[in-house]
Amino acid sequence: MPQSHIPVMLNEMLANLAPKDGEFYLDCTFGAGGYSKAILESCDCYITALDRDPNVIKKAEEIKQNYGERFDFIETNFADSFAKLKEKKFDGVVLDLGVSSMQLDIADRGFSFLHDGPLDMRMSGQGLSAEEFVNIAEEKELADVIYKYGDESFSRRIAKRIVEYRKTTRIDSTGKLAQIVRSSIGFRKGKIDPATKTFQAIRIYINNELGELERFLANVKNILKKDGRLVVVSFHSLEDRIVKNFFKENSEKPVARSKYAKDDIAIDPDKWLKIITNKALATSDKEVGLNIRARSAKLRAAKKIL
């Protein structure tokens, strides 16, 4: 049975975004609308939501009917959104980088190893599909992608098995790919499904998720108002590292000064962020018990000070 969509780290997101009446917020990853709806319900504010997945438009229309002019939706990838936002500025920006339950549970989207369907994995439906990639990529490229984006220690073994399998049969379904991976590794008691890391790796690669996160962060300063907050929920160590490093590189490191020092320290204009979360927040055991898909989530938040 499909799992209903449960927004991850919802309370932590609201606490760090701190929505207020009359303010404007940007939900960069609308999905099933969990974050947008929660922010709209928290106060009398306004939301612009983004998503490149055309399948979420119906859900966006439902929220629009309920909240009217307080809600606006733009069908676009967040990394390409700046021109479409037309110089709007926001009091807060939130990104939930995980694939939504809605995408995972629809077999035809090709994201899930639990539901057999066409091997697609494209969030926008455009560009190279997972089926095309696994059937044309060289063995070394397959291994590198699975290792880099999935942190899969058996990546070479899996890549070799994929290449052997496709010599006689095209890999055109999620079920076939999942079985190839499982047969390469074998099930280990008490561990996650062996196909988890490989599917994650191919999805991240196909959708250029890390590159688009970096591209968005490089421009987010331009759409945040002074004191505006940036909240990012990630599900992969590489995503979290990108966000962590971005916050660190753009924030002022606290300086220990003598109480006798009289001169003021000039503010570095390149250090425009103040980190709110000293370290990444993780999901509680209670939340993971209710939603196993939240187990790897991490939240970081920062505020624009210049």
From Swiss-Prot:
Keywords: Cytoplasm, Methyltransferase, rRNA processing, S-adenosyl-L-methionine, Transferase. Pfam families: Methyltransf_5. One of its GO terms (cellular component) is cytoplasm. It comes from the Bacteria. S-adenosyl-L-methionine binds at G33, G34, Y35, D51, F78, D96, Q103. GO terms for molecular function: rRNA (cytosine-N4-)-methyltransferase activity. The keyword Chloroplast does not apply. It is found in: Cytoplasm. It catalyses: cytidine(1402) in 16S rRNA + S-adenosyl-L-methionine = N(4)-methylcytidine(1402) in 16S rRNA + S-adenosyl-L-homocysteine + H(+). Its EC number is 2.1.1.199. HAMAP family: 16SrRNA_methyltr_H. Belongs to the methyltransferase superfamily. RsmH family. Specifically methylates the N4 position of cytidine in position 1402 (C1402) of 16S rRNA. This is Ribosomal RNA small subunit methyltransferase H. It comes from Rickettsia felis (strain ATCC VR-1525 / URRWXCal2). The gene is rsmH.
